[in-house]
């Protein structure tokens, strides 16, 4: 027996309950996207549910399915050009929600200082492009371990992130730091030395963000919040301005040591308190993007469009259940 729903299962069950329109709302065509009521959180398409779709097809898919925004790709958009990218978003009437910080690993946290300084020069140009198309946020992932003891590594990360934030601030861009709460990310390799623990909870990430600048905040991923032992109180204690973007999925009940990052479920299929999560965000005034990111959940045989629609439908249903969207 299947342990989770296909999109057809989801729609049939909702329809049989006489609640399809109440749960998912009417299907939006490309020209109708961006229809979330003003002042509410809005849904943004993330590439994890539409694998193999490049740019600008990802934006067109988002609009066609009914997302109000898209997690967009800076490199391909720059290749297409500023005017073409602005025209694309104007045509589709969706938002360029967020993009990755355009620094190749091991930057920004590791790597030679000279390489970092050079990357900051390019970042200024990329930030200008990002702002010009109407996007005001970027994101980067924090490793929960570091090459140095925690206090020493925190100073390095703080200094690097602060420098990045200063460049982004000139273009009014916010930077989101995504913490990784799954235990396996903090485990050392078998037979190797134990890693140096770093930051992997919401409160500590918020404190780091505060030390890095007014335009630095958190990418709040419900999966990592749940697996880090996060609480709704943690969210309620976070200033709205420090939450840059939100990722959502769901999780099955299993021992922490067995959890792997690609075992996620669609919102509503698992045990995460999504209603408490969304209601807490609403209470602090969060009104920005929410991207479904159920890594490993979309079957290989499912088309990108069906994957995107399933993510949209299940996420919207969870948000309606929580009372945060109409």
Give the predicted meaning of each segment:
Residues 1-18:
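N-terminal secretory signal peptides and thylakoid transit peptides that target proteins
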Residues 25-53, 60-64:
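C-terminal segment of N-terminal export signals and the immediately downstream linker at the start
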Residues 41-47, 70-72, 96-101, 138-140, ...:
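Hydrophobic faces of well-ordered beta-strands that scaffold small-molecule active sites
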Residues 48-54, 72-83, 106-109, 145-149, ...:
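Acidic-and-aromatic substrate-binding clefts and catalytic sites of carbohydrate-active enzymes
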Residues 50-62, 116-128, 228-235:
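Short, acidic/polar
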Residues 62, 70, 89, 130, ...:
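Conserved, mostly hydrophobic/aromatic
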Residues 68, 72-174, 224, 286-287, ...:
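Structural motif corresponding to the early beta-alpha repeats
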Residues 69, 163-271:
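Acidic/histidine-rich catalytic cores of soluble enzymes
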């Amino acid at each position: 027996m299947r342990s989770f729903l296909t999109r057809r299962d989801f729609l049939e069950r909702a329809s049989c309950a006489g609640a399809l329109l109440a749960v998912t709302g009417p299907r939006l065509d490309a020209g109708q996207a961006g229809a979330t009521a003003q002042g509410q959180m809005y849904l943004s398409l993330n590439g994890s549910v539409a694998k193999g779709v490049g740019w600008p097809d990802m934006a067109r898919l988002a609009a066609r399915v009914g997302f109000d925004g898209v997690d967009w790709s800076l490199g391909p958009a720059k290749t297409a050009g500023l005017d073409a990218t602005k025209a694309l978003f104007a045509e589709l009437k969706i938002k360029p929600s967020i993009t990755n910080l355009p620094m190749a690993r091991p930057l920004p946290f590791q790597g030679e200082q000279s390489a970092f300084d050079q990357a900051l020069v390019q970042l200024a140009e990329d930030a200008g492009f990002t702002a010009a198309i109407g996007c005001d946020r970027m994101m980067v992932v924090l490793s929960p371990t570091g090459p140095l003891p925690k206090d020493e590594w925190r100073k390095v990360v703080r200094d690097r992130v602060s420098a990045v934030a200063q460049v982004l601030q000139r273009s009014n861009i916010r930077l989101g730091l995504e913490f990784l709460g799954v235990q396996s990310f903090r485990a050392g390799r078998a037979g190797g030395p134990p890693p140096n623990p770093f930051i992997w909870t919401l409160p500590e990430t918020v404190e780091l963000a505060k030390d890095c600048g007014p335009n630095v905040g958190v990418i709040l991923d419900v999966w990592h919040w749940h697996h880090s032992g996060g609480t709704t109180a943690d969210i309620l204690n976070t200033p709205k301005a420090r939450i840059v973007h939100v990722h959502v999925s769901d999780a099955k009940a299993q021992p922490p040591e067995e959890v792997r990052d690609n075992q996620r479920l669609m919102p509503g299929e698992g045990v995460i308190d999504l209603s408490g999560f969304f209601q807490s965000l609403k209470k602090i005034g969060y009104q920005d993007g929410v991207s479904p990111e159920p890594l490993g959940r979309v079957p290989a045989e499912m088309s990108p469009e069906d994957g995107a629609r399933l993510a949209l439908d299940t996420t919207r249903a969870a948000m309606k259940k929580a009372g945060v969207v109409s």
